[in-house]
Amino acid sequence: MRSHLAVEYSLPLELLNLLHSHSWLYAGSEKAVFTGRTLEGEARFAFVLDERGNFTTTHPLSSEAAFWVATTGEIERAVIACNPIEALSILLIEQENSATAPATIYLGIERTSQLPTQFLQELDSVIIAIAEDSHLARNVLALLPNAELASSQSSWNDIWIQLIEQKQQTHKQNNQQYKQRIQEIELD
């Protein structure tokens, strides 16, 4: 299941293994299951990823519990996505593009009742990384009016995959240039 996620969504196996070691990701009936937790770490429900790439939740009415991961340090900002894959993709994009991002919590939610609203209202920055025309984005913005909306034309996971492919292409080109230069060296 982890290798499927690594291939299908270009998520690093190291990250998936880390999530698995904390029981935040596991296999259930050959499907990927992401744990929805409170900020205190109490497991409340699960996001189940089906073979078509759609998420369902086991207990959709759970309040103030979401799939989340955070970078180290005292949390200064939050990024809210519409599911665990999107949340992890944004984390990876930000780590790839900036080594100096503030300590951030990345949340994957299905509905606004899953948000730790009071906690989010106390943060310096909250980013809603959900398609702005979606019902969910509008509901989150109504709940957190000071939040910033950051939507994209495609999914965050698609953006992550494009970033990885560009990086691999650049690496391949650099290797070809290196091999060409090696061939030009005379060792007489």
Briefly describe each language-model feature range.
Residues 1-62, 70:
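Basic, glycine-enriched DNA-binding surface that flanks or lies within the catalytic cores of DNA
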Residues 53-73, 78-81, 85-110, 117:
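Catalytic phosphate/metal-binding cores of nucleic-acid and nucleotide-processing enzymes, i.e., regions
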Residues 39, 86, 133-135:
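Short, glycine-/Ser/Thr-/acidic-enriched flexible segments
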Residues 25-27, 81, 119:
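Sterically constrained small-residue positions within well-ordered secondary structures
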Residues 5, 92-188:
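TOPRIM fold recognition
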